[in-house]
């Protein structure tokens, strides 16, 4: 009986071991294989913009999907220098992120002398839409989510928690507003007004850029710049996107503009092993509550500030 149990345990261990091994083998294969859309020396550059948009590379946690303006702009400049490349496709699946990083990418796209098209496949909201608006043409899936033209600032406040456990916050500052946004004290009316003023300014820049990029009246953009998101069909009616469709419509538009068959090559940022492993893990995993997790990650990395994002 005991021998039989040992045999079962050995069998279970072997099955678990083989499962883990096959999982990591599939990850390694995905790291070193190319998608069917990629070819060498193509005339159309494909650049992915996925996850949270940040300014500097390598600031995310191991399994956090992020796009850095620093890396994306390098890819745009690289494609722009390539005389063979006639057009750039920006494949977007992002909820937005840093206002600064979003504007940096949008400005870099506008500098290029190539045909540019933004492809919102699933999500292209807030800062990601800001980026999309800078392209010559926007194609979005009819059920995709886009728009959400607005700015948000938030922080976790622990003042009530400290008070409950009889912990005091000793405030020693030189400059009355030096600790503005500290999670260990409540915002004063003056501090709240200052933050709201900054948010209003960033929101105005956002609206102004969208209106200019999309050739819309500023007043019309202001009416829909409530932070609300729109599905693709609604966005088309509002003039936020040019065309409803998918990969086929994107390629058709590009070929009409460049006058030749599209030969697409994916421009990708260089990855170290852990970065590549992170992406592969993201592609093979489903994270429940990712938005909530990102909020707590941001606070964990920057506990003494209010983060402003689009």
Locations of regions flagged by a protein language model:
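N-terminal organellar transit peptides
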Residues: 1-118, 123-127, 137-140, 153-310
């Amino acid at each position: 009986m005991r021998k039989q149990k040992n045999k079962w345990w050995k069998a279970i261990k072997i099955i678990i071991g083989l499962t883990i091994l096959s999982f990591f083998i599939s990850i390694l294969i995905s790291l070193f294989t190319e998608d069917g859309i990629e070819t060498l020396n193509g005339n159309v550059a494909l650049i992915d913009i996925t996850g949270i948009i940040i300014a500097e590379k390598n600031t995310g946690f191991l399994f956090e999907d992020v796009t850095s303006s620093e890396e994306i702009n390098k890819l745009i400049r690289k494609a722009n220098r390539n005389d063979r490349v006639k057009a750039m496709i920006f494949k977007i699946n992002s909820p937005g992120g840093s206002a600064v990083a979003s504007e940096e990418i949008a400005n870099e796209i506008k500098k290029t002398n190539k045909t540019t098209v933004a492809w919102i496949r699933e999500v292209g909201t807030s800062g990601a839409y800001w980026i999309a608006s800078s392209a010559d043409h926007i194609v979005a899936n009819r059920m995709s989510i886009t728009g959400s033209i607005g700015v948000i600032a938030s922080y976790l406040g622990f003042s009530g928690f400290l008070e409950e456990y009889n912990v005091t916050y000793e405030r020693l500052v030189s400059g009355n507003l030096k600790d503005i946004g500290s999670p260990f004290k409540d915002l004063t009316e003056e501090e709240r007004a200052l933050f709201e003023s900054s948010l209003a300014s960033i929101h105005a820049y956002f609206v102004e850029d969208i209106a200019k990029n999309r050739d819309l009246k500023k007043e019309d953009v202001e009416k829909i710049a409530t932070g609300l998101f729109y599905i693709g069909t609604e966005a088309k009616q509002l003039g936020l996107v040019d065309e409803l469709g998918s990969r086929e419509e994107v390629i058709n538009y590009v070929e009409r503009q460049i006058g030749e068959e599209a030969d697409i090559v994916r421009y990708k940022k260089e990855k170290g092993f852990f970065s590549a492993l992170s992406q592969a893990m993201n592609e093979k995993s489903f994270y429940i509550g990712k938005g909530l997790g990102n909020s707590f990650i941001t606070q964990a990395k920057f506990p003494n500030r209010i983060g402003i994002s689009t």
